[in-house]
UniProtKB/Swiss-Prot annotation:
Cellular component GO terms held in the UniProt record: bacterial nucleoid; cytoplasm
Entries under HAMAP family matching the protein: RdgC (MF_00194)
Family per similarity comment: Belongs to the RdgC family.
Annotated protein name in UniProt: Recombination-associated protein RdgC
Signal peptide boundaries: none
An annotated GO BP: regulation of DNA recombination
Compartment annotation: Cytoplasm, Nucleoid
Gene Ontology MF annotations: double-stranded DNA binding
Primary location group: cytoplasm
Length: 303
């Protein structure tokens, strides 16, 4: 339930799909497990997991969705060894070289043979659709996984006019200014971790952890042409996170004190607690994203 990373996108046009219509659209692309010959499967699953019953969990016009991906694990080395063995056998028996086209066919046959016996792994990715601030927040540290989710959502809805979050001033420039000034705009507070990169392609990377970032040792790297590409921050008293220069948010962590706001919700009804946590998280993420976009400056106009 509690998001751990954020890849952020904003709508070019208002999102006006209600819960019922969204549920209906996603239902045509639900997840089903891999069959014996499937390499991978991808689809929407229950937003609240086994305790839920719907693909979309909504409250106050905030929509939580989830995709599940199952992938068969076929180690490349296993396939290579089987391929090499088969090719060597053919070349010895027929006294000729096996062509690339033949190798590709043999490789496909080996994969088909191994698939039914292969182990599989599953992963889930959640996203929060927030029409009130015209954004989608994907709980993933991987831009690829975020784009996969959005691609399936776009397919289900027919269109999805969103673009990655970006700003007129490069984020690394803004983070560098904060570090040089020794403070970030309220309600954000700098912590003790940063990563600096040289502005030149040949330059280096330096990482600081558990260190006062206003010390001369850190500032000297900025003076020699490095910029801050990662910076640990706190938002108010509720969220710790690592801001990245690509506009993604990593290592998002809600404080125990903040999460304790729902401790009075009855533990006898797991769904009631999940619903309360969703409402609490959603409200705070909206406040967080609004403050973050304001602090990082004007967003780039969409094309």
């Amino acid at each position: 339930m509690w998001f751990k990373n954020l890849t952020l996108y904003r709508f070019n046009k208002p999102f006006s799909v209600d819960t019922e219509a969204l549920e209906t659209a996603l239902a045509d692309f639900t997840f089903s497990p891999c069959s014996s010959q499937d390499i991978s499967k991808f689809g929407f699953s229950k937003a609240l997991g086994k305790k839920g019953s719907a693909l979309v969990h909504s409250a106050e016009n905030r929509h939580l969705i989830c995709v599940t991906k199952e992938e068969k694990i076929l180690p490349g080395q296993v396939i290579k060894e089987a391929l090499d063995e088969k090719v060597a056998e053919i070349e010895e028996l027929e006294n000729r070289k096996v062509t690339k086209k033949e190798k590709d066919t043999i490789k496909d046959e080996i994969t088909t043979t191994l698939l039914p016996r292969a182990f599989s792994r599953r992963s889930q990715t959640h996203a929060l659709i927030l029409p009130e601030i015209e954004m989608i927040l994907v709980d993933s540290s991987s831009a690829t996984k975020a784009e996969e989710l959005l691609a399936l959502l776009r397919k289900a809805l027919g269109s999805l006019p969103v673009i990655p979050l970006s700003f007129t001033t490069p984020i690394e420039q803004t983070l560098t200014q904060w570090l040089q000034a020794g403070e970030s705009p309220l309600p954000f507070a700098m912590q003790d971790e940063a990563e600096l990169k040289s502005d030149s392609d040949e330059g280096g990377i330096v990482r600081f952890k558990q260190q006062v970032l206003q010390e001369d040792e850190v500032l000297a790297h900025i003076a020699t042409g490095k910029s801050v590409h990662k910076l640990a921050l706190h938002f108010a008293q509720s969220i710790a996170f690592l801001m990245q220069s690509d506009a993604s948010v990593k290592r998002l962590k809600f404080s125990e004190e903040f999460r304790a706001n729902n401790d009075e919700v009855s533990g006898e009804d797991p769904l009631a607690r999940l619903d309360a946590d969703f409402a609490l998280m959603g409200s705070e993420l909206i406040a967080f994203v609004q403050a973050l976009t304001q602090a990082l400056g004007p967003m780039e106009e969409s094309i």
